[in-house]
Amino acid sequence: MMQQAIDKVIRRQDLAETEMMAVMQGIMEGKVTDSQIGGFLTALRMKGETVEEITASAKVMRSKALVVEVNQPHSIDTCGTGGDQANTFNISTAVAFVAAAAGVTVVKHGNRSVSSQCGSADVLEKLGVNIDLTPKQVETCVEQVNMGFMFAPKFHQAMKYAAAARRELGVRTIFNILGPLTNPAKVKGQVLGVFDESLTEVMAQVLKELGVERGMVVHGLDGLDEITTTTKTKVSELKNGMISNYVIDPRQFDIPLTDKEDLAGGDAEKNASIILNIVKGETGGKRNMVLINAGAAIYVGNAANSLQEGIDRAAEVIDMGLALDKLNQLIKLSQELKV
């Protein structure tokens, strides 16, 4: 099965959903060798992944994941594919606290660093959040503080079979794309940053196929997998079953352009202190970056009627100290749940 799939993809032929599901099942059940996984992932990346191939893979990964039950109709996740090589601070992690403080249920799904200096799990841990939670404990966090964090390796244990091949390859593969698509809480809304402009519409289509109701798939034209403040951003928005494509400019929202250097992060300690300063009200380029992305999260989470309204609400909750409160609530509760 694996040899045929590799051969087909090398010849730049797309796989049908059933074929892709069979390949992913084999990988997730440890039935495929590392060299086969590496060969397949490389060939697939060179061919370019289709909506069908990505959807099929996400379905298999979701079926193998531990489940988190969230009874909120507008729960969201904020994360990107990573792989933009930009080494910015953890923008989507800061955004999660702001959106939750604005009343959006945020169930964040993340990992330690893969392609950056510091992943969301690294920075949350440095901030004092206990990331080692069971599905039930994450559910408790969501019920009590309106947000929770799922540490990907704990919830996607079958991923361990692909880990060695991915590490040895060291390049972006379909797994970078799959991370944000396999949230164990099956959230209904997503702001999803992608590392490649050509992926915005593809990923919006995949979100629709997976049953997501509201989504903004974004790619900064400076290469960032976020809505950027250094230039314009391409957006594919999923709403009411329809996908619309457009470009936004931060200046439309009275946000001045920022230099990319102003968005630089560092290790977990540095990024934790950046996030802390932002939720404490520090102004400047980093705050503006969080505002525009949190605005999108608040809009997608149905707590604002437009991106502008979302941005205004984001500024309000930071300035009122509510985002800092949300961070402290998650730290306190997650530590109390330690077993």
Swiss-Prot record:
Top-rank taxon, per record: Bacteria
Cofactor: Mg(2+)
EC number: 2.4.2.18
Binding site for 5-phospho-alpha-D-ribose 1-diphosphate: 80, 83-84, 88, 90-93, 108-116, 120
Entries under InterPro entries matching the protein: Anthranilate_Pribosyl_Tfrase, Glycosyl_Trfase_fam3, Glycosyl_Trfase_fam3_N_dom, Glycosyl_Trfase_fam3_N_dom_sf, Nuc_phospho_transferase
Keyword tags: Amino-acid biosynthesis, Aromatic amino acid biosynthesis, Glycosyltransferase, Magnesium, Metal-binding, Transferase, Tryptophan biosynthesis
Name of the protein described by the UniProt record: Anthranilate phosphoribosyltransferase
